[in-house]
Regions:
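N-proximal low-complexity "stem/linker" segments adjacent to membrane-targeting elements
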Residues: 1-25
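Conserved acidic residues
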Residues: 31, 61, 84-86, 94, ...
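Catalytic-site signature of metal-activated, phosphate-bearing donor transferases
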Residues: 73-80, 87, 96-208
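Acidic donor-binding segment of Leloir-type glycosyltransferases
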Residues: 20-65
Length: 208
């Protein structure tokens, strides 16, 4: 079994660096990393050039450019089209997986013959206030995690029937069977943000 780790990135060089450091060193040699780049950011290009040159003989890293054009589903579907793995693990550039999640995901897939695995996600927003939470209907636990386990449809079979739909707040279709990982930190994605980035994203989403 091999997995394609599909990443969408836009002007997130520091976040991409952290994510790639984990994927390069914790995934298997037969796995690949597929990166869809929106925009023309020099810092992102520098990170990608650095990783592809340093690890070209150890890891298959595919990079291509595509304009988002206010359609997140189309962007993610383009990632699917560029993947060759048996399964696809989609990760946004500002997320990163717990290392134990990466080490156990193939065992999970072997034990659960399903089309889709839902992954819990740890969301944190630096600078968030009670007023923000009330405004957006969010809840925060005693660890500062927002809406946990906030399950995400991220690991799925590569199939012509499985795709993303809706330009914003996109969701996946075509999966007939699925499983949820336990709501445990070591099996989660991390999604850290600042309140400034969150508000900027909310404003952008409202234009789509």
């Amino acid at each position: 079994m091999n997995i394609s780790y599909g990443i969408t990135v836009c002007n997130e060089a520091d976040e991409l660096n952290k994510l790639l450091e984990i994927l390069i060193h914790k995934t298997d040699k037969e796995d690949e990393i597929v990166i869809c780049v929106d925009g023309d950011d020099d810092a992102v290009r520098f990170e990608l050039d650095s990783f592809t040159q340093k690890y070209f003989d150890k890891k298959t890293i595919k990079v291509y450019q595509r304009t988002l054009d206010k359609d997140f589903a189309a962007q993610k579907n383009s990632v699917i089209e560029n993947c060759r793995g048996d399964y696809i693990f989609h990760i946004d550039a500002d997320e990163y997986p717990h290392k134990i999640l990466i080490s156990q995901i193939k065992q999970v897939l072997e034990m659960n013959e399903v089309d889709l695995v839902w992954i819990p996600r740890v969301n944190t927003v630096e600078g968030i206030t009670d007023e923000h939470c009330a405004k957006w209907g969010w809840r925060i636990n005693d660890k500062g995690w927002i809406n946990y386990p906030d399950y995400q449809a991220r690991v799925f079979k590569r199939s012509k029937d499985i795709k993303w739909i809706k330009p914003v707040h996109e969701y996946i279709t075509g999966c007939k069977t699925y499983a949820h990982l336990p709501a445990q930190e070591e099996l989660s994605l991390y999604h850290p943000k600042t309140i400034e980035k969150q508000e900027k994203q909310n404003e952008f989403y409202s234009t789509i």
